[in-house]
């Protein structure tokens, strides 16, 4: 295992990138290009609802999908997750050789410090999507990215978000961990990510992104991805 806060002591071959709530694998387009340039094979699947529909989909349903996918990938392998995807990555960290958490929803006890929200059984982000509100939510993105995101937001399971907000107990991962915190994240306060990183003795990368999704969809997404790729596969 790498020393705390140091780059991983192996060259990661593959990486599974797990998107956040209401999004999809498309969110990782910039990261995919960068990782491939660094010789890292990437998978960016969409999380799928359960057979009983989105309203019945649970956090465990998503965890099962992530575990099946990461187990199929050659080692050394990394799990990379953003927002809810970060929490899912934490829950599957036993299958990874390195873990990257981008503005992750934190596990308990830090989850208690998240802003409280009420979630319906199906969160209608697709139905209620508006280009203007999309642009406001990602001020660091260019117009083309904002338009693409507006057209691709999806509805989400309220049960998954309620479980995450209530707090999920996760032990400190045995693998190397890199946490990324946006300076102006209004959804997951950057200090929460910093506190998690300190407790887990993980490396903390603070980025100037102006939103929760900035490290993936902002103009600096490729630069952030390059820093991560160098940490995963030091040359």
Predicted regions and their residues:
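Flexible "cap/lid" loop of the alpha/beta hydrolase fold
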Residues: 94-125, 157-167
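Short beta-strand/loop motif that positions the catalytic acidic residue
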Residues: 173, 179-181
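Active-site glycine-rich loops that stabilize anionic/oxyanionic intermediates
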Residues: 20-24, 83, 183-184
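Catalytic histidine-centered segment of alpha/beta-hydrolase-like enzymes
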Residues: 210-223
